Amino acid sequence: MPTRILVADDHAIFREGLKQVIGSTVDMTVVDEAINGQELLNKVQTNDYDLVILDISMPGRNGLDVLVEMKNIRPKLPVLVMSMHPEEQYALRAYKSGASGYLTKGSPSNELLEALQKISLGKKYVSSALAESLVNGLSDTSQQDLLHSLSNREYQVMSLIASGKPVGKIATELTLSVKTVSTYRAHILRKLNMKNNAELTRFVIENKLL
């Protein structure tokens, strides 16, 4: 029986692309879709799937927080996280949140199928690029500790601020109020011992988090 896959992504074109790639195999099939975190949680709670492909950048709730909640509902359900963010930026957090694998959306189709095959067997998938990054690591363990102090949402907001997006645009993108984003920003600066966005951006760039 083919591996039954649910694809959670808010972009229809990307979902269709995944369906075509996965449809080229005989042992895997996309049986359902979700366009946001809440829909994903609802479907996982009421239906049985063999594997989930999750975009962590969907509107609304932070994708990694959704992943944690989903694993609480279905602890044994394997999840492949796919994102536009570089592996160095989110992969470790994804694994710690319960993911079985992490790929960027620019990964070739053969690597996607390899990851899905391995994950469907109950194993973890780590790309060669991520493995190299893990070996190199951050040069300063104190900086790693600072990053670990951030929540998933704070980490996401930090990345968006460092990319040059204003608070208003970040609020719209994450479906949050400007006040909430400003509060996250204040928490981030305090936890990282920084005074302004310029220092934050420099920190992110120096540690190759963007």
Language model features with spans:
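Basic, Lys/Arg-enriched C-terminal extension of HTH/homeodomain DNA-binding domains
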Residues: 189-210
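Receiver (REC) domain active-site loop signature in two-component systems and cognate sites
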Residues: 56-58
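Acidic catalytic/metal-coordinating carboxylates
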Residues: 36-39, 62-65
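Short amphipathic alpha-helix used as the core "switch/output" element in two-component signaling
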Residues: 64-76
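Active-site beta3 strand of CheY-like receiver
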Residues: 47-53
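Short, flexible helix-to-coil linker/hinge segments that flank and couple to helix-turn-helix
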Residues: 89-96, 100-152, 156, 209
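Helix-turn-helix DNA-binding segment
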Residues: 144-179
